[in-house]
Amino acid sequence: MSHAPGFLALIEAKRAQVREVSVAQARDRAAAGARLIDIREQSEWAAGHASGAEYVGKGVIERDIEGRVPNKDAEIILYCGGGFRSVLAADALQQMGYTNVVSMAGGWREWNALGAPTEA
């Protein structure tokens, strides 16, 4: 999928403010208790997602996250399809006071390509 230049510029600007982790790091951190949150569209989630992930769509994450993860120091790993939307969502959560939120680089495509565990 080709992305518009303005969108890519926004992502790059936000990437400078958001920490990213690899799929391997995300798996290790999730196994140690971090919250792994899939922010893709509901149809993407239903087609398959990372084992152990929970769903909070990007369209509602700012509205719903405090009810799902009230501890603003909790470790949160966000992922989307390719690692772009999750950067934007991580930035938004940081602005809301979450101190330990990261974006998983490469997103679902990288998770799947590496053969990490999935469920549907």
What are these regions (language model features)?
Residues 1-35, 42-77, 81-120:
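Rhodanese-like catalytic fold shared by cysteine-dependent sulfurtransferases
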